[in-house]
Amino acid sequence: MFDLDKFWQFFNAEMKKSYSTVAYNAWFKNTKPISFNKKTKEMIIAVESPVAKGYWEKNLASQLIQEAYAYADMEIQPKFEVAGKEGPERLVTPQPRIKTNQEILENRRDEFAQDLQLNSKYTFDTFVQGEGNKLAAGAALAVADNPGSFYNPLFIFGGVGLGKTHLMQAIGHQMLAEKPHAKVVYIQSETFVNDFINSIKNKTQAEFRNKYRNCDLLLVDDIQFFSKKEGIQEEFFHTFETLYNDQKQIVMTSDRLPTEIPELSERLVSRFAWGLQVEITPPDLETRIAILRKKAETDGLAIDDSTLDYIASQVDTNIRELEGALVKVQAHATIEREDINVDLAKEALADLKLVQKNRGLQISKIQEVVANYFQTSTTELKGKKRVKQIVVPRQIAMYLSRELTDSSLPKIGQEFGGKDHTTVMHACDKISRALKTDAEIKAAVYDLKAMLEH
């Protein structure tokens, strides 16, 4: 006899093995089974919000079906309902996000509507998840579901063109879809700087503070631009404090961790760590293919899988360059009046040599070259020995990994035997200082750079 509660315990135990704590708390913790019809095999599950409903239907329903089959050798029919305060009720699908946001932009006349510049394409529906971004996507969806309570602030970091802005703006779109009158402010950090400077010049600081401190959701892109700007950091600190204390959601993006931003005040570094800091890394091959397929479908392009595979294999850096390669192939096909296929893609991308040009150095290659140069081994570089003959080469290898690759400090630390990012930061700082005073280290770094760049 099928016991719904026991099955749900089994299912949750399996999901805890497969998902991070962040993802589990976001999607499984507050999701409950309501009923199971033995005849139709329909299982009704209550989820917290329309966002969660869409996520379960799109990403988790198949896993639920598989686990039920493994548990009881039966194929269930899951149905997801949004739970209200008195049980499942809100079953109407929300208005399409893009249309809702357009109506808001057309009808709202206050200062927030004037400043809101969300890209209509940057929604959760158009975001392609993969291994490199699924944690960030899960966190963003959780924030969209529970702004001000889940992961506040949310700090998304990673290289250029990996989808940080897309996820950030998707949160804004979702809030406006759920609450059309919400006050959402999306800005580049440079805009905050310029607005602050202008408010001083024009003596409009009260208006400036009212704008940024009285919103429901503040989205700040490229926060690293605040580097070395003490006055701006002071102003943003007070903005942060006001919003946080009022339980308003703050989301920031950066190309690096707060601890890596030069001369960012300690109190901002500390506060940015109050919520969740999550990294987006370059997409793997499978994700790149999925991104290209989504882009092709959106643009109405007929491209077979083998051609998509080829294009994806040529660009492994970021989404922006990946989509740029597809545009180049499309343009070449239009000019030549030919169908898109592998041969045409090879011809279109021949002059780019994208992989060779953009893949850059691997940390493993840097470790190998440094180890050979100092007559040691990569195992020693990754190890824990603290003797000078090993420590200095290890620090130089970490420094070069930071200088010559796009890897974050946590990623570099992982490649050096799972060391903490603060250890990497200390090594980089030490070598940077030594380059100014130690001729021997300076010569070694110069030699190694020359070897690695050729």
From Swiss-Prot:
It holds the Pfam family Bac_DnaA. SUPFAM superfamilies: P-loop containing nucleoside triphosphate hydrolases (SSF52540), TrpR-like (SSF48295). Residues 74-116 are annotated as: Domain II. Residues 117-333 are annotated as: Domain III, AAA+ region. Keywords: ATP-binding, Cytoplasm, DNA replication, DNA-binding, Lipid-binding, Nucleotide-binding. ATP binds at residues 161, 163-165. SMART domains: AAA (SM00382), Bac_DnaA_C (SM00760). One of its GO terms (biological process) is DNA replication initiation. The keyword ATP-binding applies. The keyword DNA-binding applies. Gene3D superfamilies: 1.10.1750.10, 1.10.8.60, 3.30.300.180, P-loop containing nucleotide triphosphate hydrolases (3.40.50.300). Residues 334-454 are annotated as: Domain IV, binds dsDNA. It is found in: Cytoplasm. Residues 1-74 are annotated as: Domain I, interacts with DnaA modulators. Its main location: cytoplasm. GO terms for molecular function: ATP binding; ATP hydrolysis activity; DNA replication origin binding; lipid binding. One of its GO terms (cellular component) is plasma membrane. Transmembrane segments: none annotated. Oligomerizes as a right-handed, spiral filament on DNA at oriC. Domain I is involved in oligomerization and binding regulators, domain II is flexibile and of varying length in different bacteria, domain III forms the AAA+ region, while domain IV binds dsDNA. Plays an essential role in the initiation and regulation of chromosomal replication. ATP-DnaA binds to the origin of replication (oriC) to initiate formation of the DNA replication initiation complex once per cell cycle. Binds the DnaA box (a 9 base pair repeat at the origin) and separates the double-stranded (ds)DNA. Forms a right-handed helical filament on oriC DNA; dsDNA binds to the exterior of the filament while single-stranded (ss)DNA is stabiized in the filament's interior. Belongs to the DnaA family. This is Chromosomal replication initiator protein DnaA.
